[in-house]
Amino acid sequence: MFLHSLHLQHFRNYRDQTVQFQAPKTILLGENAQGKTNLLEAVELFSTLRSHRVSRDRDLVQTGAESALLTAVVERDSGEQQLQIQLQQQGRRRVQRDGEVLRRQLDLLGSLCSVQFSSLDLDLVRGGPQQRRVWLDRLLIQLQPIYAHLQQQYGRVLRQRNALLRRAESLDLALLAPLNWQLAQLGVHIMRRRSRAIQRLVPLAAHWHREISGQREQLIVAYQPSVLAPDDTDEAIAWQERMLAQIEARRAAELGQRTSLVGPHRDDLNLSINGTEARLQASQGQQRTLVLSLKLAELELIEAVLGEPPLLLLDDVLAELDLRRQQQLLEAIANRFQTLITTTHLSAFDQSWVETAQILTVQSGHLQSEAVPMAPSSASLHKSLDS
């Protein structure tokens, strides 16, 4: 897939800006707080319907405006599509594809896929379980758009159940029974999908980690569900029964803490290098290698599932990588994936890489083109992939 253009109206610090992407690699050059990351955030919204920076749509709408309008033109193997998201200061979003208003915004998922890599991704290693769950969920939303619907349903049941648990003194336990069943049913659907995604991701990430570490390190990524699958199987009914039994066993603790303690909202991932938990003992260099390996594995997995390469969004990440890791990343992506990369300077880039990139200078929400190589088609991206 290839993103040909973005039109941003009253989005963040962009009042009315059209961006034409005309090369496999686009460098967004500018000082901090000029709008480089905002542009990547717009692409992220089309990919996941979420921002990793804020949770409220009104925070994305330019100050003084009632709404923001984002329009993307994307070329897929099946043809060109126009995607549109309207964000409101007050009220619900509205999404369109090729001029048709979509009844459910989730139906836009899968139209434009991307992998984002920023300095914040180091929290995958050193942060808490929530950071790792969010990363895995964002991947799954693009691999299986139905996953976003499962998450919504699970979140609704979880909130209802927690509201009851907060009334512990006067709670009629019979009210929990139907919610327990729904939580187990939806929770197992989520855990099965997470487990299968990790199974496919692990060999790809392990390969990249060996390559980047010069064959010196072995990466192991282990999914740690809140409820273990019975007898090394992910058969749904047996897993649900085990989750219900665990909920019953934790009833006293849940009533005491007034919150749900069992389910995929308590999952984690264990990341280890050469048998040692990375969060505890990995050096900064090893942590960066690990995250870079996961991101390259994400790219390959999305491409394998969708049959088309996703976009790669690099948000000022080269500053976090030493020269060797930078070179490995740039060699890995080459012209294989359309790449948007933000930076404050060009000195970190190989000159030949800069010469083939489109360079856009970003200043206070305005873009100016510095270099404009010929735009490739989606088919030519596939051709470079096969060569």
Curated annotation (Swiss-Prot):
It is found in: Cytoplasm. Keywords: ATP-binding, Cytoplasm, DNA damage, DNA repair, DNA replication, DNA-binding, Nucleotide-binding, SOS response. It comes from the Bacteria. GO terms for molecular function: ATP binding; single-stranded DNA binding. InterPro entries: DNA-binding_RecF, DNA-binding_RecF_CS, P-loop_NTPase, RecF/RecN/SMC_N, RecF_2. GO terms for cellular component: cytoplasm. GO terms for biological process: DNA replication; DNA synthesis involved in DNA repair; double-strand break repair; SOS response. Coiled coil: none annotated. The keyword Nucleotide-binding applies. Its main location: cytoplasm. The keyword rRNA-binding does not apply. ATP binds at G30, E31, N32, A33, Q34, G35, K36, T37. PROSITE patterns: RECF_1 (PS00617), RECF_2 (PS00618). HAMAP family: RecF. Belongs to the RecF family. NCBIfam families: recf. The RecF protein is involved in DNA metabolism; it is required for DNA replication and normal SOS inducibility. RecF binds preferentially to single-stranded, linear DNA. It also seems to bind ATP. This is DNA replication and repair protein RecF. It comes from Synechococcus sp. (strain ATCC 27144 / PCC 6301 / SAUG 1402/1). The lineage of its organism: Bacteria, Bacillati, Cyanobacteriota, Cyanophyceae, Synechococcales.
